[in-house]
Amino acid sequence: MKKIRLGVIGTGLAWERLHYPALKELADRYEVAALVNRTRSDAEAFADKIGLDRKNVYDNYEEMLKRNDIDAVDVLVPIDQNYKVSEDVAKSGKSFICEKPMAPDIGQAREFLELSRKHIVKIMIAENYRYNEENNKIKQLISEGRIGSVVYFIKNNITCFPCEMAEDTYAGTEWRQHPDFPGGAFLDAALHDLAAVRHIFGAVECVQAFGKPQKEDFNPYLSVSANMLFKNGVIGQYTYFPSGKEQQKPPVGFRIFGTKGEIYLEEKSSGVINVAYNDGAPEKIGYTPERGYYNELLNFYNALNGSEDISVTPEMEFGDVKTVFDILDSVKSRKIVYVDDPQPVEYQPHAGATENSRPYIQ
């Protein structure tokens, strides 16, 4: 089995705590061949930790991209740099993984779609929620009709970003506290949840959202609440509250109501999916939490070796990112915003505004 020699751009928290632990499990498939970080000493410290010679450490990723012995690249940089770094990697002819979101705004996200069309490279967007076991099992339960036809869902995400700002956490990073991109934490974190519901229910027809504004830099709204209509007729309500604490137990979590029963996921790390059927019978379905990183890196390896396709392509991720920005647009305009469908003709400002090609429809 040929190992993929991986070059890493960005050796911060996402690399150290998410990608590298998964790569250790895949040591028979991957070899870390080079590390790049703008603070070179941080990359050198990590190289020492894993026994990588410091000659393979860089503070300039362009130098690393010149190497012919690098098979693929893992891009883990701040959100505002994702597109620029990815473009340079694509131009080098190397296949790569890019952490989500693919870009800091919808314009750069559209440009990202062109990278795999212009360059003969394979690109994965590392949206781990699409690879997490709980979301795939829930999707399977629904496709099997275990709770009948889905009528609606409720999904709550309540966290305390301010509580973690002074700690050694993602919230403690300067660029997340004072983001140089629209949406702040909503783009960074709520994107995961929206990717999950799109993975489970499919393409979104339209959204209508409201937000409670705040002055703090990390997120433009104290909370955001969005009503969602999916193309298959499912309706649902998603709320993101990054400055709160959910004191009552069990939490609202993720609840899906069908004609024959209900699915309840307390939180992604709970390890169990609760199913309650209308005849009174309960069922508990176990899963291993946080397997998305392992699964996505395994998928990337298999794709590079030609045994399977990449599951989360830029086209797939574009729909997730567009949903985020469409929700934010709806909050600002207080209007319904169409996501994966063009706006109905009767509401078009002019006939030429309709888009016929929607590559991100799932």
Give residue ranges: language-model regions.
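N-terminal Rossmann-like dinucleotide-binding module
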Residues: 1-50, 360-361
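Predominantly a Rossmann-like dinucleotide-binding segment in NAD(P)-dependent oxidoreductases
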Residues: 129-216, 334
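Beta-loop-alpha module in the N-terminal Rossmann-like domain of NAD(P)-dependent dehydrogenases
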Residues: 55-115
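Glycine- and charged-residue-rich phosphate/anionic-cofactor binding loop of Rossmann-like
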Residues: 31-32, 282-287, 303-320
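Contiguous beta-strand/loop segments that form the cofactor/metal-binding neighborhood of enzyme cores
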Residues: 188, 194-270, 294-310, 340-362
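Hydrophobic residues in well-ordered beta-strands that form the structural core
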Residues: 15, 59, 98, 123-125, ...
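Rossmann-fold dehydrogenase core element
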Residues: 111-129, 149-151
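Active-site loop of classical SDR/Rossmann-like NAD(P)-dependent oxidoreductases
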Residues: 14, 38, 286-298
